[in-house]
């Protein structure tokens, strides 16, 4: 039986996936052995006694570091072992075309995967706790958005989620109040969304027109009701002592940027 060693200086996920794709093209049984975290020449030497025990073998390598990659290749040639360096030739070709040197960062793909899954997790979080569906996520939230109806809480939550930030949004309504749990979390996480009364009236009227709603429309988009809600939201935000952001005539991206800067977001790692 043929054994393919998938060797990498990171978790060997890329090497493993390439090997699986190749093995799937053959009916014969092929054994795949994953060998991660080979970052030094000494570590290459350490794995060879085990490799030497296998009669029929191939090595598929995604090692990035040049000296380790070249040493592994020479070692294989000396031992008459077939080796395929998956990333090396591609990196060299692109480097030549761009006339620049690559960074040679082991585990770069894993970092990309981690960022991707962090975004997915944040999006699922935002949907689960959207618009006060459940307050159980407050303690796990990176950001808590509070504001009146039609202050862009949901789209802002989703925009932040796309940056890997877990955001929960809570609507402010005089009849309902806010959950007691909100007073127990770090106020630095809480952001109050404020808006000009005239713009809020206009937004709500357009919302009603869009769905042809007549009942209770006067109250929902009426001047007195909106002024009452604005006064209520101001009281809550002052009581919480949270940061406030005026979203009047402000794009969601701009509001998100303010929040990301305030929480110290690092765009390179999707963390803060």
Curated annotation (Swiss-Prot):
Coiled-coil boundaries: none
Taxonomic lineage from the root: Bacteria, Bacillati, Bacillota, Clostridia, Eubacteriales
Source organism of this protein record: Clostridium botulinum (strain Eklund 17B / Type B)
PANTHER family attached to this UniProt entry: PYRUVATE, PHOSPHATE DIKINASE REGULATORY PROTEIN 1, CHLOROPLASTIC
Membrane-spanning ranges: none
Keyword Kinase in record: yes
Binding site for ADP: 147-154
Family: Belongs to the pyruvate, phosphate/water dikinase regulatory protein family. PDRP subfamily.
GO molecular function: ADP binding; ATP binding; phosphotransferase activity, phosphate group as acceptor; protein serine/threonine kinase activity
Functional note: Bifunctional serine/threonine kinase and phosphorylase involved in the regulation of the pyruvate, phosphate dikinase (PPDK) by catalyzing its phosphorylation/dephosphorylation.
EC number: 2.7.11.32, 2.7.4.27
Keywords annotated in UniProt: Kinase, Nucleotide-binding, Serine/threonine-protein kinase, Transferase
Catalysed conversion reaction: N(tele)-phospho-L-histidyl/L-threonyl-[pyruvate, phosphate dikinase] + ADP = N(tele)-phospho-L-histidyl/O-phospho-L-threonyl-[pyruvate, phosphate dikinase] + AMP + H(+); N(tele)-phospho-L-histidyl/O-phospho-L-threonyl-[pyruvate, phosphate dikinase] + phosphate + H(+) = N(tele)-phospho-L-histidyl/L-threonyl-[pyruvate, phosphate dikinase] + diphosphate
The name this protein goes by in its record: Putative pyruvate, phosphate dikinase regulatory protein
S-S bonds: none
């Amino acid at each position: 039986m043929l054994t393919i060693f998938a060797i990498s200086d990171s978790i060997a996920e890329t090497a493993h996936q390439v090997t699986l794709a190749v093995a799937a093209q053959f009916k014969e049984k092929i054994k795949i052995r994953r060998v991660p975290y080979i970052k030094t020449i000494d570590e290459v030497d350490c794995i060879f006694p085990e490799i030497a025990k296998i009669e029929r073998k191939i090595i598929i390598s995604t090692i990035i570091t040049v000296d380790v990659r070249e040493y592994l290749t020479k070692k294989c040639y000396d031992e008459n072992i077939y080796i395929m360096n998956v990333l090396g030739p591609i990196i060299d070709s692109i480097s030549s075309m761009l006339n620049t040197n690559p960074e040679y960062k082991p585990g770069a793909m894993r970092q990309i995967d981690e960022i991707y899954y962090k975004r997915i997790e944040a999006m699922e979080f935002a949907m689960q706790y959207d618009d006060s569906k459940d307050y159980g996520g407050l303690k796990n939230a990176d950001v808590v958005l509070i504001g009146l109806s039609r202050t862009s809480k949901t789209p802002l939550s989703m925009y932040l989620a796309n940056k890997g930030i877990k955001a929960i949004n809570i609507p402010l309504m005089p009849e309902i109040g806010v959950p007691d749990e909100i007073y127990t979390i770090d106020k630095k996480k809480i952001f109050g969304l404020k808006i000009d009364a005239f713009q809020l009236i206009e937004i709500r009227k357009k919302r009603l027109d869009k769905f042809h709603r007549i009942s209770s429309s006067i109250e929902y988009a009426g001047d007195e009701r909106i002024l009452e809600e604005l006064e209520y939201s101001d009281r809550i935000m002052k009581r919480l002592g949270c940061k406030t952001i005026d979203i009047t005539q402000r794009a969601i991206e701009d509001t998100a940027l303010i929040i990301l800067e305030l929480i110290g977001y690092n765009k390179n790692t999707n963390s803060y």
